[in-house]
A protein has these predicted regions:
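Membrane-interface "cap" regions at the ends of multi-pass membrane proteins
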Residues: 1-56, 64-66, 184-185, 405, ...
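Loop-to-transmembrane helix boundary motifs in multi-pass membrane proteins
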Residues: 4-13, 94, 122-129, 238-242, ...
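C-terminal membrane-solvent junction of multi-pass transporters and transport-like membrane proteins
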Residues: 3, 135, 152, 337-343, ...
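Helix-loop-helix junctions that connect adjacent transmembrane segments
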Residues: 37-38, 118-123, 152-302
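TM-loop-TM module centered on a large, flexible mid-protein loop between adjacent transmembrane helices
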Residues: 71-72, 78, 110-115, 188-203, ...
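Hydrophobic transmembrane alpha-helices that form the core helical bundles
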Residues: 31, 49-140, 306-326, 370-383, ...
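Membrane-interface loop-to-helix entry segments
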Residues: 123-189, 225, 248-252, 378, ...
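A generic transmembrane alpha-helix motif of multi-pass inner-membrane proteins
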Residues: 158, 167-170, 375, 380-388, ...
Length: 487
């Protein structure tokens, strides 16, 4: 038998960083100015690292069974909760698509030299719908070109523009240009402090008068999600027990560095009132490139970022839904969802997925402010994902007691107490962030806070109830079939 090819600590760290890092979050963090350090620290040390460590133990324990989070939660509790976990992982990804497609729409708007389109809800909505269905059609064909596109997307569409914006910020400051961080309006009390002499200074810790002042925490947390996707590779390390924590801390350091430097670059160049959640990065490019009379580079950056965003959609469009296909083949979902085409692609699941994305993308069209729609979708996405993470932490703790003899090539250090500490900290951080998602951010013109909260609550409840309704319906159908067979 051929020897398995192991991966190195650095390779796993880079794989994890690639799954986590996205440029679309830079404007959101930049709006927090220097208080971004509080949010990034919270997301890195109370979410990213605990999720990676617990995910690694679960992934190494059930690597041979497959099914990911479905298997982890099913083994800890039951198949209904396992299905709920994989369903939430899938549906949050479905809700995520309109946010990244909205970001791609803004990229295209700047690429064609019409930045105003980035705030045109009709353009953003129709672009998101059209691009998603195009990506779905390509996925259904099973073309080999997809792998090449997605492998280059991170490097060309994320790393390169990220480095460019950081370098341009350094050049901007070295040239003696105004630093936007030093000219924040005194009305933004969450991120500035006014001393006795009425001088305005950026805060390092957010001024919190209510949950709305830290509502961006939920959206920032989402930027650090998906680390558990690569936790299953822990057994492929030569020494998982020592190498995996090092890989995760290295990935956390890379993510912390790129997110922090990139967001700082946006905050340094772009005036506070021009930082837009969806198109703030491109405003930064436009300001700095126009200043140095190379405005055409804004179009180039728009093209690169759009390529990276669309490549990201194509890389995820089939993957998470395969988890649902796996549960369908186990009889947890209706038989028609088991259908695959000649390329082995789960066609019916992707069609349903596309219909949901179309409906959610329509929010850009019907809502007055594109940024509010963008953040609303982000809040709904992170709320669903955080519930799945709570289930994952609970599964990790419970399995230490229900299956203590289970072979784990990687274990969270410190015995059961260590698992309680890591899993408990992660669970509490996620629970707090989940509560925050229901509060509208004070930094955005949401109009009616009650309407915003109502939309998030209803959307979360609808998607949370769906796996239970499906499980109940499938159990009733099986019961009816069993009774019918007995007659």
């Amino acid at each position: 038998m051929a020897k398995r090819k192991n991966i190195t600590t650095t390779q796993l760290a880079l794989m994890t960083a690639a799954a986590v890092i996205s440029l679309r979050g830079l404007p959101m963090m930049a709006q927090e100015e220097l208080t971004m350090f509080f949010y990034i620290f919270f997301a890195t040390f109370l979410f990213l690292i605990p999720a990676a460590l617990v995910g690694a133990e679960l992934g190494s324990a059930f690597a041979s069974k497959g099914g990911g989070v479905y298997t982890w939660v099913k083994e800890a509790f039951n198949k209904h909760l396992g299905f709920t976990a994989i369903f939430l992982q899938w549906i949050q990804n479905v809700v995520w698509y309109p946010t990244v497609l909205g970001f791609a729409a803004a990229s295209i708007a700047y690429m064609i030299g019409m930045p105003g389109l980035a705030q045109n809800g009709l353009f953003v909505g129709l672009f998101s719908i059209a691009m998603y269905w195009c990506a779905t059609l390509v996925t259904l064909r099973g073309t080999s070109a997809i792998s090449g596109i997605t492998s280059k997307g991170f490097l060309i569409g994320t790393v390169l523009p990220g480095i460019v914006v950081i370098v341009m910020a350094v050049i901007w400051m070295a040239g003696g240009n105004p630093v936007a961080l030093e000219h924040i309006p005194d009305t933004v009390s969450q991120v500035v402090n006014i001393d006795a002499a009425h001088h305005v200074h950026p805060r390092l810790f957010p001024h919190i008068t209510g949950m709305s002042d830290i509502a961006f925490l939920a959206g920032i947390l989402l930027l650090f999600a998906d680390v558990e996707v690569h936790a299953v590779h822990a057994p492929e390390l030569d020494k998982p027990q020592t190498q995996f924590p090092r890989a995760m801390f290295l990935a956390a350091l890379i993510s912390f560095g790129l997110f922090t430097l990139g967001a700082l670059a946006v905050a340094i160049i772009t005036p506070y009132d021009q930082i837009n959640l969806q198109s703030g990065l491109f405003t930064t490019f436009q300001i700095v490139f126009d200043h140095y009379h190379i405005g055409w580079l804004s179009n180039v950056m728009g093209l690169l970022v759009a390529f990276g965003a669309l490549a990201g959609v194509m890389s995820w469009i089939s993957g998470p839904s395969r988890g649902l296909l796996w549960t369908a083949q186990e009889g947890v979902l209706p038989c028609f969802l088991q259908k695959t085409n000649k390329n082995g692609v789960q066609v019916n699941i992707l069609v349903i997925q596309g219909c949901i994305v179309t409906l959610l993308s329509s929010l850009y069209i019907v809502m007055d402010d594109v940024s509010v729609a963008f953040f609303l979708l982000s809040a709904l996405t992170v709320g669903l994902y955080l519930v799945m993470y709570m289930m994952m932490y609970a599964a990790g703790i419970r399995l230490r007691y229900t299956q203590p003899g289970l072979t784990r090539s990687y274990r969270v250090p410190g015995g059961n107490a260590g698992m309680w500490a890591v899993g408990g900290i992660g669970f509490l951080a996620v629970l707090f962030s989940f509560i925050v998602t229901f509060f509208p951010p004070s930094q955005l013109p949401v109009g009616s806070p009650a309407t915003y909260t109502w939309l998030v609550v209803v959307g979360t409840l609808v998607f949370l109830s769906m796996p239970f309704i499906i499980s109940f319906a499938m159990d009733r159908r099986k019961g009816a079939n069993t009774t019918g067979s007995g007659k």
